[in-house]
Amino acid sequence: MTQLKWLLVVVFLLFSLAEGIYLVYKLQVSDMTLRQYFLQRVYPVIMKMAGKTATRLEQKGVQPPLSFYTLQAVQNNDSVLDFSAFRGKKVLLVNTASDCGYTGQYAELEELHRRFPGAVVVLGFPANDFKEQEKGDDATIAQFCKRNYGVSFPIFKKASVIKGTHQHPVYRWLTDPAQNGWNSKTPSWNFSKYLVNEAGELTHYFDPAVSPLGEEVIQALEQ
């Protein structure tokens, strides 16, 4: 029995060593810090164990007083994206951050982008509004997204998404009932999600804890 215990200890140590070597390698070939690596893996689990509820809002058939298709935004490569290009498509808008426990959702958003080509558009809006978890400049953010998650969907210039004088016009539309027709809910944290349907109507809001690949999001996209 003693020999078996020692064997298990040795196996555990070897496994831990191998995992440590892999972690060092992964961090060397990416732009992630050790803090970012563990935060992305631990934070969602802690939130789930704590029983933190995730807000979900849904409202269909409400015509927005201000057309969604009049909006535009500047991408982080300085090109202007006119939202009139999204007619006939669903659009998922997400405020993002590189140093958040939910940053791993970039990978899920990229999967959505690839799963529904031509039917669903994913848009990322980096923001430093929540605990300053997006301190990098636009070039740094673009490199981080591409290198760590292979992001190919549009990422816009960093801006504020919460209500105030500096709120991005797109997020002013998303959070002002006078513009979108019904919703006043602002992002509760990084990776809050808003869904606009093929007719340019805001139909859903999902809190950060709701996975982009979660059943309710997929159902909303497939409706």
Locate each region found by the language model.
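N-terminal Sec-pathway targeting helices
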Residues: M1-S16
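Conserved hydrophobic packing residues within short motifs/helices of P-loop NTPase cores
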Residues: V91-L93, L123, Y194
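Structural microenvironment flanking redox-active thiols in thiol-disulfide oxidoreductases
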Residues: Y102-Q167
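Thiol-/selenol-based redox modules, centered on thioredoxin-like
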Residues: P169-R172, D176-Q223
